[in-house]
Swiss-Prot record:
Top-rank taxon, per record: Eukaryota
One GO CC term, this protein: plasma membrane
Localization in the cell: Membrane
Keywords: Membrane, Transmembrane, Transmembrane helix
Transmembrane segments: 19-39, 63-83, 90-110, 220-240
Gene (name only): TSPAN11
Pfam families: Tetraspanin
Major location (coarse): membrane
Family stated for the protein in its record: Belongs to the tetraspanin (TM4SF) family.
Bilayer topology annotation: Multi-pass membrane protein
UniProt name for this protein: Tetraspanin-11
InterPro entries the record matches: Tetraspanin/Peripherin, Tetraspanin_animals, Tetraspanin_EC2_sf
SUPFAM superfamilies named among the record's database cross-references: Tetraspanin
Amino acid sequence: MAHYKVEQDDWLTVYLKYLLFIFNFFFWVGGAAVMAVGVWTLVEKSGYLGVLASSTFAASAYILIFAGALVMVTGFLGFGAVIREDRGCLSAYFCLLLAIFLVELVAGVLAHVYYQRLSDELKQHLTRTLAENYRQPGAAEITASVDRLQQDFKCCGSNSSADWLQSSYILSPEAEGRRVPDSCCKTVVARCGQRAHPSNIYKVEGGCISKLEQFLADHLLLMGAVGIGVACLQICGMILTCGLHRRLQLHFY
């Protein structure tokens, strides 16, 4: 009977090792996905960050990149800990899993807080940006962000093209008679903004605010979904790590 119990204990240890090894593979892939989402958000969509009043959106993406990179490094430690059956490495692996979980939790909270105030921030800041900062000295980044926003989303003005009538740029001689910036035009050519007819410029219900709000909401949802998926994996991993650590401890004694 004692011999059977020893064999059973050995099989439990082997079973836990295989489970943890499989988990670690998916965990490593999940880390790569988290980092990829963060990098993609910053690289491909950074052109819109200049029109946001808060840096929370960018901060969430940076945290995801950091967490993803840490996950991939931790994954290698996990493979080594399982293969070597080293309790010290397993303890370090568990601590890193817990640390990554907390980092992702912070990113999730930031994303949720930002999502709650997203609409109000856009309405206040984008309208003011168009009126006060577009084509003004020292505002080249904001100007480029607004131009890209209007061209990519095929919109004009924060709520409508009429918002540009309050713009310092449009009211200045520099505008050369433009009623909207050239980036509002369906086909951008020099001084095309002088003709603000629906056949020439984008007329979108809700303006650029509605388009940008939906875009940011979709990205926050994607970041949240990826983060939650990896966090669930981590909880499973911590449970398996504790189980294997306990089995190895019993074998040691």
